[in-house]
Structure formats: C-alpha cells, structure tokens
C-alpha cells in the first residue's frame, strides 16, 4: 500500500499547480497580482533536455495520473472537494508559519498561527475555513518563497523526470524542504504524512485539469504554453525585495 501511495505522489507532480483560472472563450488567466519587479521572462537554457523529459512525463501523466484526477473529479461533489481543499490547506499552514518567520514577517507569522489554531479547533481539524471569515487569510509560503523574499531569482527552468516542472530556486520544495521544515510532519504518523501528500497532489492535479486538457488539445506547442503558465503563476505568487531587478541570463 505504501508503494502505491508513494507512486501516486510522484506521478501527481508531473503537472504542477499553476493557480490558473478558467474564463470565457477558452482563455486562461493567472490568479494573483502581477509582480512588476519579478522575473517575467523564462530562462530555459536546458530546453532540449527539458522537452524530452516533458514528453516522457506527459505519457506517464496521460496513462496513470490524469485518470486518477478525473476519478477524483467524478466521485466527489463540490462540498467534499471544498472540505478536502480546506483540510489540506490547514495541514500546510505550519509550513507557512515557519517561512513567514524566516522572512522576519511577525504580523503574517502570527496571523498564520492564529489561522491554524482557529481552523484546527473551530474548523474541525481544518475541514472548514473559519479563520478566513474573521479576516485571517494567509498566502501559502514555501522555502522558495522565502528565498525569493531575500532576492533569489528563479534561475533556470527545469523539467525533472517524474517530479515535473520547477526551477533552480524552487526545486527542493516538492522534494525535501516543504516537508523537512513543516513542524506538523514531526508529530504525525508516517502513514498519515504519505496520505496527506498523496491527496494534496491529487487535488493539485485535479485543479489544473481544465488548463492541461485545453493546452494538450489546442496548443501548437504544449511545452511552451505550460512553461509560461507555471512560471508566470509562480512569479506572481512570490514577493521580492523592494527595488529587486531580475538578473539578465548569461548567454
């Protein structure tokens, strides 16, 4: 059973969550404000290698993981999906607390602490997002977000076998860092951690189903479309230091 869970986790990473929003006329936009001082241009010096890995990952996704996401979509109603999303978000709130702390952002650190406590208790283990109703919203932070806070640019775009799309700055997030520095993971059973990770990846893949399906069917170059969407969505989600300028790629 553990092997199946771990396999699901790995396969779920083939398409990263891009926080994309479907709008009319088959056009996709990016959630979140535009980060004017971010690195809006993708740096892809390893494109030849990345394309080969992208093709490999796409086959695995089509055969194995996309069907899992479609199954999740079909067997759960909107109410269940909302409870799952709220629960998963709450589980990762301690990670946000740690990263806001590393960013020396006291206000958002304390808001995230209170958000976790309220949703864990009054929200029945995080199944309901009670904290947002009292003004305690919190943007999910990763170690990559913290590095960006201190002026670390995304670096080269990478597509890794099985793991999927990332960049030099964020590549440890989905593999090691997010779980190594999440305090909750040290106080829960390993089986629980694996299930949480698997479910979160399944929901992430479900969220991008409309976008990935549209791109794979209609785009003349799915690699470029997905690369651009993931990169811009990620850049819109991080906050660089004031007056930060993205370094120009070396030729």
From Swiss-Prot:
UniProt family annotation: Belongs to the MlaA family.
A Pfam family per the record: MlaA
Record keywords: Signal
Source organism per UniProt: Rickettsia prowazekii (strain Madrid E)
Entry's Gene Ontology BP terms: intermembrane phospholipid transfer
Domain of life the protein comes from: Bacteria
Xref: InterPro entries: MlaA
A GO CC term attached to the entry: membrane
Signal peptide stretch: 1-18
Descriptive protein name: Uncharacterized protein RP093
